[in-house]
Amino acid sequence: TYNVCNKDVKIDELKKYMKDLVPTYMIPNYFIKLKEIPINSNGKADRKALSTIKYTVERENKYEAPRNDFEKTLKKIVEKEMNITNVGIDDDILNLGADSLTLMRITAELLDQKYEVSIQKFYEQKTIRKINDTLYQEIDENDKLKDDVYYNFNEKDPSEKIKFSNVLLTGATGFLGIHILNELIKNTKANVYCLIRDKNGINGKERLKEKISFYFGKELLREIDKRIYVIKGDISNNLLGLDEDEYKKLGYKIDLVIHSAAIVNHYGKKEIFELINVTGTKNIAEFCKSYNIKLNHISTISVSADFVSNKKISKEFNEHTLYIGQPYKKNIYVKTKFEAEYNLLKEMAKGLEVTIFRLGNITSRYCDGKFQENDYQNAFLNRILSFIKIGKVTNEMLDYEFDMSPVDICSEFIIKILEYQSSYGKVFHIANNNKITLKGIIKALNISNIKIVTQEEFRNSIKNNKEIIGIINDITNNVIFGKNININSDFTQNYLNKLNLNWCKINNSYIRKYVKKYIE
């Protein structure tokens, strides 16, 4: 943390002061004293200028030197990429100021030196010593879940519609969440209460207005305070961050909850993932149990661990299963979404009315190609762009099948499904059954300079091209390009057919709209 102070203040005094302002895990171990904070033309802290300031780590703890070649290599790379000196093996790399982009560059440099270290390893181990000590440690996949959790899977066909007037929506500022909000306003008569926390000094209402303006414009904005209401709260807090009276009033008012809030990055601080994805979901379930409210939970097909499993699993993953022996602990996002779903399935078995929607690859709108605001963070898109940029693929990668599920179609299907009583007590796979291959994308984009190479040649090409962050991140985070887990969504497809809902075909025009802007 950079700070400006007119007098000498001890680090422990700064930490003590910050304890009253932020959670303990957000208090940094390192403070960098400056004469002044550089300001950019917008009057904000100039992060670019801050990153160029070379400084020596000041510490309370004793400096510990590297013990082996790996630690020496990592120390050298960290100091180079972060423009600092005097990094010891017990210094917290994240608290020194490393963000996800810095960690991507560090892992790319390590890959060039024949060391494969995942970004998540930095978030979990934090220091050079701990990263070294766990470098070749296998993830313990032994699990108490010997068999899949049991729940009474409701086999009824859609017939009876439910009535709901007031919906509580979490995650309304997210890409899927904002489209669910639009779908509720457009195609139901319900009022929607959006639980949103303040962030970076911007209150929840303003945050929602910004997102609505970006994705939908004035028509939906007019519904604020008419059918769309913002409640300041936080799913990770007790009573959802509300006082007891507010919590009670909300509980008696709401007929239906759609829980879309989640941390969806594939790496990050374990504590935050667990707080939002696991504890937050428990808090929402507790709210629904207390007031006998139907719960619709947005999960992910990634709980199958299909993209991190490097071994063939014979058992099929479908809507009736959760744990089939897949290595879900390999990825922090998958692990926490798995645990959230596991907890909800247990609640379902006890009588809570829950519908779980496992989403596939959510892509741009089918109607007009509009994509998520923070598209540069989309792992699926980055992967495709990386293949195109490097100009090389393997045969296995060319034939790998995946879904492209437009966000407007996903949100429409979710709302249509949850309107039926028979949908509760079920799990659905909301993923386009009209699959596409990388070969199909390359053909649609009319790209002719892609070479087919061996796995070894492909990996060597990546190691010499550190700009291909999307693929480097996949390699260092154990992402697999192959089908080691058989995912079956027949139950969902049959259910959709009964509702006369059909997935769109992904044509060349849609693919070009999705990718072309980024290639240019």
Model feature map: region roles:
Residues 1-67, 71, 75:
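AMP-dependent adenylate-forming
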Residues 12, 16, 61-87, 102-112, ...:
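Thiotemplate assembly-line natural product biosynthesis machinery
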Residues 22-45, 86, 102-105, 113-135:
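AMP-binding/adenylate-forming catalytic domain of the ANL superfamily
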Residues 33, 75-99, 103, 112-121, ...:
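Phosphopantetheine carrier-protein modules
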Residues 91-113, 126, 130, 171-179:
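Phosphopantetheine-attachment site and its flanking helix in carrier
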Residues 139-260:
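N-terminal Rossmann/SDR dinucleotide-binding element
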Residues 251-252, 256-260, 267-275, 279-332, ...:
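Conserved Rossmann-fold NAD(P)-dependent oxidoreductase catalytic core, especially the SDR/UDP-sugar
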Residues 416-476:
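Mid/C-terminal beta-alpha module of Rossmann-like enzyme folds, strongest
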